[in-house]
Amino acid sequence: DCMRYDHFKAIIPLLEPLFNIKLEYCLSLLPTATPYSRNAIFSGMFPDEMVEKYPHQASDMKEDAPSLNQYEKEFLIDQLKLFELNDVSLHYHKIWAVDEGNKFQNRVKDYANQDLITLVVNFVDILAHKSSQMDVLKEMVPDESGYRLAVKNWLEQSWLLKVLKYFSEMGFSVVMTSDHGSIRVQNDVMVSADRTASSGVRYKYGR
């Protein structure tokens, strides 16, 4: 989540010993926010197509539900069925914190017999949000080069690199992608709205 192109370029030296890397470019779906762009990855659909097939998603968006990405596994299963891949065995795992990542690493061999392992990793997105809120992170990530270095240093010491090394040893093909990136704001703008307006910073709806 939130991994930019320059972040990926920064971590390539850590991945090159493990994999033959093929780099392909894509654009994020608009609006570049997780409820839309990541759901598009798992469903293979544009937002208007999604709300037609999944009406509950439309109602969740209108009600500003706390999580608009809770059905990612179901979306992915449906997309596999669309491509007549019903027999593909799947393990889906969303990781928010280091403890969860360590638990996944310790159990990764249990999932090795699955045809498809899907990981959602939120560290880079959390770093993007928290680096503007916490003074200690403002010191550690003062600019774009610091941001890239922080992402590389995290991966180098993380459970995820250990998991990728295991995948490499097992001969797995790995696809690493991102739902959106981030931009460091230099000139912020105050948006006036009533209390029914959405609270997100990437896009707004309401009055």
Where do the language-model regions lie?
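Feature captures the catalytic ectodomains and active-site-proximal regions of enzymes
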Residues: 2-207
